[in-house]
Amino acid sequence: SAMVVKYRPDLAGFVTTNHRGATGGGIALLERIGAGTVDMGEIQIHPTVEQQTSYLISESIRGGGAILVNQQGNRFFNEMETRDKVSAAIIALPEHFAYIIFDEHVRAKNKAADEYIAKGFVTSASSPRQLAEKLGMDYHAFLNTLERYNGFVEKQHDDDFGRTTALRAPINEGPCHAI
């Protein structure tokens, strides 16, 4: 991670899904014998990695109909954009993280969600209000976000961020979940 931070200081503190041996030692060795490097700041990161365990949360959750919200309970970006763009949007948030929000409909259609629940990554609640309270976010903003997103699903057009894929079903079937 020292090499990552050397070239991308904005990634300080973020965990990696790489194996422990991926430290850049080979690059450092080659530099010592005179090799040049290019584009070292071009580091691909995944936007949804559980930050305590470095466990990658599959894109299939977002693709199944989940949304991303910030600590205030608001959507802030097109969840289905490319990894680099979604990651950059999350890094730009003051809190540097986002919640993946989904309901029972998404959970039932995505086996990975049950794995995340079993591993303890998921916060669940019987209602959006209870979920917002558990996450320490403003319930009214969160409910407005869900209502607005559900309207986009109904008309199959995201007026806010231009999401054109995975507008599968409204997020309204309890329990509600967050990673």
Please annotate each region the language model reported.
Residues 1, 30, 142:
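Conserved hydrophobic/aromatic pocket- or pore-lining residues that grip, position, or stack substrates
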Residues 1-8:
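Flavin (primarily FAD) binding-site architecture
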Residues 10-22:
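A short acidic, glycine-rich active-site loop
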Residues 11, 41-45, 72-79, 152-156, ...:
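Short linear motifs at secondary-structure transitions and domain/linker junctions
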Residues 11-12, 52-56, 179:
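Intrinsically disordered, low-complexity segments enriched in polar/charged residues with Gly/Pro
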Residues 21-28, 140:
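Short alpha-helical basic/polar micro-motif
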Residues 27-137:
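An anion/pyrophosphate-binding glycine-rich loop and adjacent beta-alpha core
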Residues 141-179:
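A glycine-rich dinucleotide-binding beta-alpha-beta segment and adjacent secondary-structure elements
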